[in-house]
Amino acid sequence: PLLINYVAFILFTAANGVVMRDAIKSFIDVGDNTAIILFGLVSFIIGFIGYELIHRLGAIMSALSGMIFLVVAVLALQNPLPVGAMDLNQGFALAAFALTVTQAASWTLGFGPYVADYSRYLPANISSKQTFWFSYLGNLLGAGLVMLLGAVLATMFTDVTSNPGNAIASFFGPWSKVAMVIVVLGVLEINSLNLYSAYMSAMTIFSGMRGMTRISRKVKFIAMGLSALAATLIAIATQYDFNAYFADILIAQVYFLVPWSAVNLADYYLVKKGKYVVEDMYCADGIYGKYNVSTMVIYLIGVASTVPFMDMSFYHSYFAKMIGADVSWVPALIVPAVLYV
């Protein structure tokens, strides 16, 4: 699961590089590949400096980005939507509904690794209930509102998915460059967070198995540098087929992250009921051990349960063809949870 987390962070880092390619080119006269490389390099520098810078930048960019998106929403909604866009009498389309639910589930459950990684930095007096609701509502509102805005912008711009920065900046006239800078900095922040998270996942694998208590800056530089390099190469390789690439990684999250989320939820709420020996989680010889064979088998069965429902650009399963969309998150959530309990 940690390896899957690592891969997911790398793939999203690559996706951000592609999305910001044209935004970088609007400031600097460079080619496509160079723009992606520059974006990856700056992301690496911020990520390497560390958590404190990422956290402070995130707080600032949350406020600035929120204002930018609010202004864009107000201006965009002043334009008429396409005829029939809000017509609820078109009939119910199961395929469209199932696809929307799957993508929403993938995005929401994919937020889990961020919560797990960074909730550990919270003060001890912050309750689990507070952590849950602030994380959930932040994810729901942050993603949901921006997705709704993206749907509106998609009716106005043909290239909004591949070049959202220019679409957003176009609303600000002579201030478009300022708006573009804010958009780029906002994506830089989450990109550096992705790289930092990938580094943490990679180091947790080795430190957990070897009982390491400290990671040197040299090791951090190498691990994060290799991660940034991998993400940049993937971005360069997929930049001209981005929509299929991003759709695949969004759906693929379901196959690998949801079964493990199901195991964690079942363990926390139904088996352990929130009672853990935290110190032993950091000890390879503790009561939890290095790994649990039966749990890993359950996880793999959970992954296997998604195969008959998979729907990707290169593979369409039987049930995906029948339903018209991927609903693999349902067995991915139910099967491992039932087996674990």
Positions of PLM-derived features:
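Helix-loop-helix connectors at the membrane interface of multi-pass transporters/channels
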Residues: 1, 16-34, 123, 194-225, ...
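C-terminal membrane-solvent junction of multi-pass transporters and transport-like membrane proteins
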Residues: 221, 260-337
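Transmembrane helix-loop boundary segments of multi-pass membrane transporters
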Residues: 22-36, 52-61, 164-179, 185, ...
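Hydrophobic alpha-helical segments and their helix-loop junctions in multi-pass secondary transporters
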Residues: 30, 64-89, 104-109, 149-156, ...
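Transmembrane alpha-helical segments of multi-pass small-molecule transport proteins
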Residues: 2-3, 27-49, 63-74, 104-115, ...
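Hydrophobic, membrane-embedded alpha-helices of multi-pass small-molecule transporters
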Residues: 73-79, 89-153, 175-195, 288-306
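Membrane-interface loop-to-helix entry segments
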Residues: 34, 38-39, 43-76, 91-92, ...
